[in-house]
Amino acid sequence: MKTGKIIKVSGPLVVAEGMDEANIYDVCKVGEKGLIGEIIEMRGDKASIQVYEETSGIGPGDPVVTTGEPLSVELGPGLIESMFDGIQRPLDAFMEAAKSSFLTRGVSVPSLNREKKWDFKPTAKVGDDVKSGTVIGTVQETPVVEQRIMIPIGIEGKIKEIKAGSFTVTETIAIVETEKGDREVQLMQKWPVRKGRPYSAKINPVEPMLTGQRVIDTFFPVAKGGAAAIPGPFGAGKTVTQHQIAKWGDAEIVVYVGCGERGNEMTDVVNEFPELIDPKTGESLMKRTVLIANTSNMPVAAREASIYTGITIAEYFRDMGYSVSIMADSTSRWAEALREMSGRLEEMPGDEGYPAYLGSRLADYYERAGKVECLGNDGRIGSITAIGAVSPPGGDISEPVSQSTLRIVKVFWGLDAQLAYQRHFPTINWLTSYSLYADTIDKWMNGNVAENWGALRLEAMTILQDEAQLQEIVRLVGIDALSEKDRLKLDVAKSIREDYLQQNGFHEIDTYTSLKKQYKMLNLILGYRKEAERALEAGVYLNDILAMEDLKDRIARSKYIHEDDLEKMDQIVVDLKNAIDNLINKGGVANA
């Protein structure tokens, strides 16, 4: 370990000399308190160090010691249900060590609990050939998550010894005989955060990640292994949308990174998730969640590390064969941290002061998402779905972070302040949003949900787009200028908007909608259009059709029908057909 000397302090940036033996991205202990920092630039024997803790009180002449290791995370049992800061210090152990409710400088705590014992059940036996990524046993970490203990990257050989029983994360569970001698394997392994974990092959994502949010699953789906962005102005509901996806998304593991956002938003997650029950497992949602809290009142530099820490933990669970979703809230704050460090390093600024390499850094992050065939000999398939919130100042998505993100991701959920003011949630604007996975996922839906799913989705989307054009005419010359067919189209579009797209995240039934129910709801609304058009062709007045208040009310309330009572929707379809038949036969208002 080489000791250097500080010659300059500029906020979170410290420059030290005498560091000629250090490497870029090495972790350093800065000052007498041993603050954690990372070398981000080397010039001769001078190192520029990004410090992840408050640097007040540090000055020229103070020592800097390099550890010779890059910033790494500890991967093993104990990750699930934990809450870490941006450099993977567990906040509960941090509080005990610091004896304070506030983040204290210079406190060093291990990321994974060194005392807790975990029950290890071997699945491999002595004499088995193993290589990087081979699963040699399991640990039941929570009732929902089984950790598959893998051979660390870079080890290949024969198992010489393997033990069953209770072990801490640092105790040896197996010995592998390699060409370079015996290698010990523990429950825990380390991995540098800036380097993506390797895999056998990348696979094209075709299966949707279901979220239970109708506007997402039906119109703008994201594939398992895809990448999505949620840009929107303040108060448009980015965080609530991410919370909903984290709660109800059908990923097996959720990594939630609160990066530079308000502390009370992380508090909401910590308070809500343990009480919410996962509809698939019947267990608390917290039993499959890893939280990384790096809120706006924590040091700016640590924001950059928090995103990498999160994606590395996600890759570890992906390598086990799980489907993982990672929420980053918000990547704009992370980009602001990059901008601050770039300014302190006196680099040439790009657009709006952001560094010229902003686009490539964002791409590095999103490209670590994807569906892959994992290392090992059993052909496991794992995926990471990355969902990043973007907070453009004033909601202007022409700024660099939004534009760089949109060039990379394939799904854009554009949040609209106008919809938020109208109390329409989720505030995803159906005219500006898009999903490049929609055609691929339609094929999956047609095969797994209903043959005409894609056709229904297209019909509903066309109606919503036509509505926007018809609204222009109505604003200019009034609704009376429209034909009856167009007025009916406006009525159906209103039903799609208010009864289908709008969803109450706080209602116990409406907060989550299965694919089967989504199909039945959409089929019901578009079935109403089909029947109403049949009546118009038979000469029934539009006002008589619109006067069927009771039936329209039942269609609107179908979103509150329980998942176990979906046959009630089939009854509404029958009643609707009968009511239209009555109208055609009588030529008057149906007594529905």
UniProtKB/Swiss-Prot annotation:
One biological process term in Gene Ontology: proton motive force-driven plasma membrane ATP synthesis
UniProt key word Calcium: no
Keyword terms: ATP synthesis, ATP-binding, Hydrogen ion transport, Ion transport, Nucleotide-binding, Translocase, Transport
GO CC annotation, single: proton-transporting ATP synthase complex
Record-listed E.C. numbers: 7.1.2.2
GO molecular function, a single term: proton-transporting ATP synthase activity, rotational mechanism
CDD domains hit by this protein: ATP-synt_V_A-type_alpha_C, ATP-synt_V_A-type_alpha_N, V_A-ATPase_A
Catalytic reaction equation(s): ATP + H2O + 4 H(+)(in) = ADP + phosphate + 5 H(+)(out)
One Pfam family matching this protein: ATP-synt_ab_N
UniProt cross-references to InterPro entries, sorted A to Z: ATP-synt_VA_C, ATP-synth_a_Xtn, ATP_synth_asu-like_sf, ATPase_F1/V1/A1_a/bsu_N, ATPase_F1/V1/A1_a/bsu_N_sf, ATPase_F1/V1/A1_a/bsu_nucl-bd, ATPase_F1/V1_b/a_C, P-loop_NTPase
Binding residues annotated for ATP, in chain numbering: 232-239
Top-level taxon of origin: Bacteria
Signal peptide coordinates: none
Coiled-coil ranges per UniProt: none
Keyword tRNA-binding in annotation: no
HAMAP family, sorted: ATP_synth_A_arch
UniProt record similarity statement: Belongs to the ATPase alpha/beta chains family.
Primary role: Produces ATP from ADP in the presence of a proton gradient across the membrane. The V-type alpha chain is a catalytic subunit.
NCBIfam families on file: PRK04192.1 (NF003220)
Protein's name in the database: V-type ATP synthase alpha chain
Species per Swiss-Prot/TrEMBL record: Clostridium botulinum (strain Eklund 17B / Type B)
Lineage of the organism: Bacteria, Bacillati, Bacillota, Clostridia, Eubacteriales
